[in-house]
Curated annotation (Swiss-Prot):
Its EC number is 7.1.1.-. NDH is composed of at least 16 different subunits, 5 of which are encoded in the nucleus. Pfam families: Proton_antipo_C (PF01010), Proton_antipo_M (PF00361), Proton_antipo_N (PF00662). Its main location: plastid. Belongs to the complex I subunit 5 family. It comes from Aethionema cordifolium. It is found in: Plastid, Chloroplast thylakoid membrane. PANTHER family: NADH-UBIQUINONE OXIDOREDUCTASE CHAIN 5. This is NAD(P)H-quinone oxidoreductase subunit 5, chloroplastic. It is a multi-pass membrane protein. Keywords: Chloroplast, Membrane, NAD, NADP, Plastid, Plastoquinone, Quinone, Thylakoid, Translocase, Transmembrane, Transmembrane helix, Transport.
Amino acid sequence: MEHTYQYSWIIPFIPLPVPILLGGGLLLFPTATKNLRRTWSFLSIFLLSIVMIFSLYLSIQQIIISCIHQNVWSWTINNDLSFEFGYFIDPLTCIMLILITTVGILVLIYSDNYMSHDQGYLRFFAYMGFFNTSMLGLVTSSNLIQIYFFWELVGMCSYLLIGFWFTRPIAANACQKAFVTNRVGDFGLLLGILGLYWVTGSFEFQDLFEIFNNLILNNRVNLLFLTLCAFLLFMGPIAKSAQFPLHVWLPDAMEGPTPISALIHAATMVAAGIFLVARLLPLFIVIPSIMYIISLIGIITILLGATLALAQKDIKRGLAYSTMSQLGYMMLALGMGSYRSALFHLITHAYSKALLFLGSGSIIHSMEAIVGYSPDKSQNMILMGGLTKHVPITKTAFLLGTLSLCGIPPLACFWSKDEILTDSLLFSPIFAIIACSTAGLTAFYMFRIYLLTFEGHLNTYFLNYSGKKSSSFYSISLWGKEDEKKINRNFCLVPLLTMNNKKGASFFSKKTYKINNNVRNKTLITVANGALNKRTFYYPHESDNTILFPMLVLLLFTLFIGAIGIPLNQEGFDILSKLFTPSINLLHKNSTNFVDWYEFFRNATFSVSIAFFGIFIAYCLYKPFYSSLLNLTLLNSFQKWSSNPICWEKLINCLYNWSYNRAYIDTFYKKSLTESIRRLAKQIHFFDKRIIDGITNGVGITSFFVAEFTKYIGGSRISSYLFLYLSYVFLFFLFLKILN
């Protein structure tokens, strides 16, 4: 076993050859490199599979013999300065390694088909390989400086992947927004690291925890300063894990390709913030005020993310806000000191949410054949509906992922979320009420997404089935708001959206490729005014096997991964507890290992009842009773069921505006920060251009004219120049004499 640990340092570097070789190949041998494009995807999957096998072996060793293995090398720069780097293997590291590699492999397989049409296929796999290297280096780091180095690399990879389609202005703005927002948190993290080093003199985790605890116990340092350093450290995870108030980048990050959303913004990158808080929990736990701040940020994020997801029409943005809310649950658990529950939910949520994102990608991929290659249309749920019979496998996988996130047993997220809700009851009644209420909201908005996407009929062709001759249709904006626009009665929407029916022009390149495998056509014959009308309609088709296979594997994880936290005997033994022995849990310090099954079933019944209530409300409001686009809006659904529609209209309008406008937080940042900074920049530019440059240029121009004047007075004679020079010197000294 010791021999195995000695080679753990190589884990982050195994996927690195792919981005290096791809980058060099595209620069030096572009044609040959592009001809081997499928080889690069296979190599990426193969290398990451090696890391996964290595990680599984390390995890088994951790379960058998729970230990911490650290190996550090020292790089001495001079007698007073040296830098230490190495690797740190413990149960937390093993969990993150398995999570990164399993989800990463499945996303790479999925991407091989999903990105096959894109001209940036090789660039995509180069970025993915570099991102995997950065994440693996982050979770195996042995000190804070090493973590910060890989933390920044992860941020850079996120910037590149979110802005992968950088020719689209929206994607370019989204990656800049993500980069700048994360820089705020990263700056705080750097200040916190430097502050802790100034106090403790060490960056190594074990030394840092020991020195930090001794300083607080012996009261040898200012507690306020340590609290400030701890909060600055926490700023990094706030930004990286999209916690309030630095959450604004996550929904915009959905402008990247869907596989990126599954890997970075569901399973790994946003989990990096949770990982760092879990890694530094022995440091945070001795400062009660910081623990309360962590739990407070978590509970605010839970509620905010859930409410913002209520009125989203873009399927990926709805899932993004769901991710934000679920990360809040993990942060709440860490703030309560429930280390095991937080990491358990990190695992279950990662697989369930990756399944949902890949499912949404399959839906988008199928819808693109119908509505064209515009995210405004292919991701908009108001143009979907009735996909059950067209994409049955995707529908089944998406439904089970939705039920898991809702907390329905025996799916994965039920077990972990139930633990967090139970622990919140012990921590704070107010926090428990908010957490339980948000569990109901989660079930509501997740089932809303499912119903709008799969139930009813395909809304793209709705006007053709309604039987009404309407002179208007609904133009869907980026956020899904319907704006009624007048059009010609003879205007045909379908041929425009199908883009010549048999070929789809890539949204990102002029090259076309066939999409026959993703579309089916049906001919409808109708009788109007005694004449036969023949029209052909196109419907989405189930995705290819290379897209479905990763979804089915993630479906198995969603079904069975919760078993690692289920007690296997009367003593309460389970795999997760064995892996985290000894673990931190402030809420169950004096509890025995025996499982109170009565209490478990009571709490589970309560949480499942809340989830079913949310599902029932969503079903009542969004089940399509009749064919009308108006039925898909939250407002009109409440009007139909409410006895007092005016009050409901005001309430739901307020809620809709809150969700649609992102709780006005983006607007606040735009008005108070962005526009203020731009005004300040314009004023500084004016001062620099007109005042600073004006003075400099004025001196130069004055000297020029004085020289020209002198030249004409002197008549180009040296004696005249000498006389003028001496006269000026005499006048200068005379002036000084007068002043004195």
